[in-house]
Amino acid sequence: MAALRQWRIPFLNEFIFGTVPHLGNHAVGVLYPPRLIALLFGSSLGHGLIVVGHMLMLGLGMVALARRLGLSSLGGAIAGVVVVLIGSTQTKTVQFEQIQPLAWLPLLLLALHGCVTARRGWREVGVLAIVATGTLLSGHPQLILEVVFVAALFTIGLIVRYRTGLVRLGVAAGLSVAMALPQLLATLDARSMASLDEGRSFTDLSNGMYILQVRKAAQALFGTITGGDPAAFSGAFEAIGWFGVAGVIVGAIGIVAALKSSSDRWWSLPLAATIILGLIWSLGPRTPVFTIAYRLIPGFDLGRVSVRWLAVVGIALALFVGVGVDAARSLLSRRISRTLASAIVLVAIVIGLGPITSGSRLAGAIWLLTAALVLIVPVVAQPRHVGRVLGFVVVVELAVMSVSAIPNRITMDSAVGETASPAISELMSVAKSGGSVIALTPDAGPHDELVRGLRPNANTWFDLHSLDGYDGGVQVTQPWTEMLRAFSADPAIDLPLRSSLSAPVPSQQLGRFGVRWMVLDNDRAPSEWVPDWNGPIAEDARYSVWENPFWNGDSVAWFAARPPVAGLADILRTEYSSVSATAFADIDLNCTEYCQPTRLDSTRITAEHLVITAEVDRPALVVTNVQAFKGWEATVNGLPVDALVVDGIFIGVAVDAGSHIIELRYQPAWWWPAVIVAISALVIAMVMVFRQRVTS
């Protein structure tokens, strides 16, 4: 946000992982226009408004889509209310980067329908291109992939039904890719450096926290009105579906009714397939269906949390709930009501006797009562009111469950990161003199305490640089994961750096990689964790701050260097004393005396622009603690020089004896060409949308 306020594109994030791509982290949505709201209202309020706006867009978009597909005003309204009340949607509101793509799904399907069915003109093509671009820019790549997948199935149904529109769809797709080109290229560029470039393994994808657990499947899908922690009840935070028993039953009625209708089958079949596939894929890599998708669908293997497919399952189900409300009179048929009752009894038996549980007898009893209520409604209500009453039951059940939804459980009196603890406040002051920080503080607890304890990435709130960080995507680079072996023989590469540290911490290696400050929670004994560190520099009732005596500096001149060797990080861990004065880069520097590296003055003007002042009495390798990747350009005294990769991760340049001003600037070569293409495509799309038709 600070970069945007200065009219700069934040290509890099200087505060985590020793500087990593920021624009290339698709989930951040740097180029997503609604993010500008945060510039006007501040980060906390601004992102709250963004979430509210997207919830409105999701609900109203669902109403519009339902009406376009032939639902009644009642069915459309119920679908719109249900889609914002279900647990999978409510949970995503605390992750703005995930609710944003989901909010576009109904509008994207609506725009696809308009583009294919338009009789003439190109206005609908331009509208679809703009909506598709909004989707591509909107946030988390896994959710974008899910939305695009649903849209692809829906498009197949459209083509089969209307047998036209391929050219129009192709033009819209081309324009949307062109408009999103700067972001797409940044994402691909970042992915090429990421440790997950080859995709995630089945072992990673089988993590119980990231899949729908069979035993708790009913709990995750039906939810409960008994209160308690939704994440614990569902098996995991990401597994919260909470569609409600009434919602699932009425949605099932809607699926059957839509599939039976020849006029609705073209769209109901793809969306029913979305629900089936989404549920199967949410179970993780335990079925052939998942394996096939893992092998064949581009990007499918990059999604860490399989259970996130429940989000699009919920959106599709909400639409079918609207259909079910419209088709509620079918329950007046004894044959249909008996079939439904039999299905409910079968599910109850599976939950009661099988591997799937209800969590508690009370929850199971409430599920049965709710199902019975759905069956009773057609008997006691007037035929013309059956749909309204069923819709009311669904909405009330979801509304009651939403009282204990995740957003209502993590509310705080003040904005996250609004205040720092006394120790962290002092650290913010002394850290202005340089050095990065690592925090050995709790990984669980109240959200405001996690932020004050500098949980990885939270240090950004306080303008504190760190070699540590947390991300499930492209910001975990290959050089960074390889560097972890300098601190541990068996590092946890999917977790923050601090998870690979044991007592006592490797002070010399941390100092070499720029770590000057250590924050300890008071449950850790300093004599055990940082026995050779100076301090405490600051302390309070929760934390203490310590200074590393082996810190080399943010920028350093090395006088001894040799080419990199295999297993470099292991050498730095096990044989550090023999290489403490030697840097590893594609350069040979011999030194016989006074070989210890020298700290240099450096200024970070922006994340993408650094200036280093060096005065050396012999040839040296000047290094700064910033990750080296494509896009960096270096000059020495105004003349371009080659940038070198040092110690497998940082950027450096070779200089001769003398005084030097070294400048490092980052901007990828593809940026301006991509911007020109994007602006041109936007102009074309806008002309399509707003041009006036000339009639004779």
Enumerate the predicted regions with their spans.
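Periplasmic/ER-lumenal interhelical loops and adjacent helix-loop junctions
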Residues: 1-11, 173, 178-258, 280, ...
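Membrane-interface coil-to-helix junctions
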Residues: 1-59, 81-106, 204-237, 243, ...
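Selective detector of the "anchor" transmembrane alpha-helix that sits immediately C-terminal
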Residues: 49-63, 245-252, 269, 670-693
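Active-site-proximal, structured, solvent-exposed surfaces of multi-pass membrane proteins
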Residues: 8, 280, 349, 579-696
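C-terminal substrate/ligand-recognition segments
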Residues: 46, 50-53, 244-257, 261-286, ...
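Membrane-embedded helix bundles of polyisoprenyl
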Residues: 56-69, 73-160, 168-187, 193-194, ...
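Extracytoplasmic
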Residues: 199-205, 210, 359-367, 383-386, ...
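Contiguous transmembrane helix-bundle modules in multi-pass membrane proteins
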Residues: 96-103, 115-118, 123-133, 143, ...
